[in-house]
Amino acid sequence: MAYDLDRFTSRRSAVHATGGMVATSQPLAAQAGLSILRDGGNAFDAAVATAAALNVVEPTSTGLGGDVFALYRTADGEVGSMRACGGAPAEATIENVSQSVREHDDAESWYPEARGYAVDGGDENEDLEMPFLGPHAVTVPGTARGWETTVEELGTLSLADVLEPAIRYAIDGYPVSEVISYYWQGAPRLFTDDHAREAYLFEEEPPDPGQVVTLERLGESMQKIADEGADIVYEGEIGEAIAAEIQDQGGFMTLEDLAAFEPEFLEPVSTTYNGTEVFELPPNNQGLIALEALNIAEEIGAGDHPYDSPERVHAFAEAMKLAFVDGHHYITDPEYETVPPLASKAFARERAAAIGDTPIQDPEVGVPTNAAEDADTVLLTVGDSEGNLVSYINSRFAGFGSGIVAGDTGIALQNRGASFSLTPDHPNSLEPGKRPFHTLVPAIAKFDEDDWAAFGVMGGYMQPQGHLQVISNLVDYGMGEQEALDAPRWRYREDGTLGVEERLPAQTGLVRKGHDVRILQPSLFGGAQLVRRTDDVLTGATEPRKDGQAVGF
């Protein structure tokens, strides 16, 4: 079916309620989370219920084969975070993966769009890129254990209770939404994997909008997790299927790799931006990039420019450019290498000096004082009547991930390992047990003691750029919550160009400043969700570029 998702723009209003609020990219998933709140669960229970439902109704973006991160503010005012992100298998060394790439008959299929690499001969690992698809791109999935840990440590209901709506959608069926049908149509790697074809195609075709589908295999796996707990994924039947599938396709993951995984609770990192405190997760993800960009933008007064001016976009984009260069150079798994304090105000002052009236060409990495353009991810935000707020993000990285579905489980496995490098001295060089650089970044903002928001912007390297723009829209320009998400966006791109939405008013002025401006489709500018609690009132806003919905009671 041919249709244009972006032909017309629909108007949305922010949603207000006091009993509870859920905002996410799929209405059916939002309703699943809301049902848990109505049944007495708290925001954390509802977050897992919503995430599980998204696994079913938005399977192009998320699932049990991926990872999950959470950033939250509890009813008593504590700000915390959880990382459920696994690492590389114990046998996944640079040498082993490089040899496998050179010798495997199907290695070319692991590199979409002829990425260019050496397959035959040569001893230099620099000739090789880390595979983007296939068994070596799969790291230990953290989602199942992350869901279980969230409910056990922060929730009030059982895992079986919160998984029930998702299981019902998977077994009984649901109508596919417009945006998800669009992405489902564009998943060509499914056609090369028998288990994926059986689990996610219907009479050999992706579903059309409104078509009712069932995902029985996935639903059966979820029911097993509900009955037996996450151990079945890491030590039992489902884990055995994951390890066997990866090994059958030439990878190294074992049941022992899966069994060794545990989620972690971490101290968030934060900075202030024009009086608002913004909290992010610490490395191994992009949180520090967002904070560094906010600090640089504050230092140069980026938010002082008129909203419609090219000077505003130029200033913020240059701050983002420098933060990306630094983040991609320094951020790695902190258990393997120390990550410097990129979020310090002093470092931002040094970096701000490089920004002028024209774009920086070939920016150099800063030295802190210290001792996929597109990606498929889901984000949800939840608030409850007790005062809990949570930003919860779940992803397999690129679409259906590695292109591998684990046997008859219906679980599509992520390709986060594609972020590793096969160059030994690279900050994100592949090492056994090491966690890859992660794009997932949920966020919390504190405007004052009685005014907090859980928010985020899904979408690969758009995520920290989206955080910067949403916070500035709220803080610098006084926008309402839905307005801040509706506003036209820009994004700095890896090739040095500046992508903008067609409705961004500053395009011509940016070209005059020397920017190489490209008009991009709205789907490349991320998907934001936000729930704000001001005094005792919850306000929800959702991404107009997605199918999403904010619902409250």
Where do the protein language model's features map onto the residues?
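Noncatalytic scaffold domains of N-terminal-nucleophile
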Residues: M1-Q31, S35, A43-G229, V233-E235, ...
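Short, well-structured alpha-helical segments that form the helix of a local strand-helix-strand
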Residues: F44-A51, A160-I171, A241-A244, Y307-F324, ...
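Active-site rim segments in enzyme catalytic domains, especially the processed small/beta chain
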Residues: V56-T60, D67-R83, A88, V97-S98, ...
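Short beta-strand scaffold segments in enzyme catalytic cores
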Residues: T62, G66-T74, V378-V382, P442-I444, ...
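Short, small/polar residue-rich loop motifs at catalytic or cofactor-binding pockets
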Residues: F265, D374-T377, H438-L440
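Internal maturation/activation junctions in enzymes
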Residues: E299-R396, D408-T409, R416, Q521
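Extended C-terminal subregions enriched in glycine
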Residues: E337, K434, H467, D476-P522
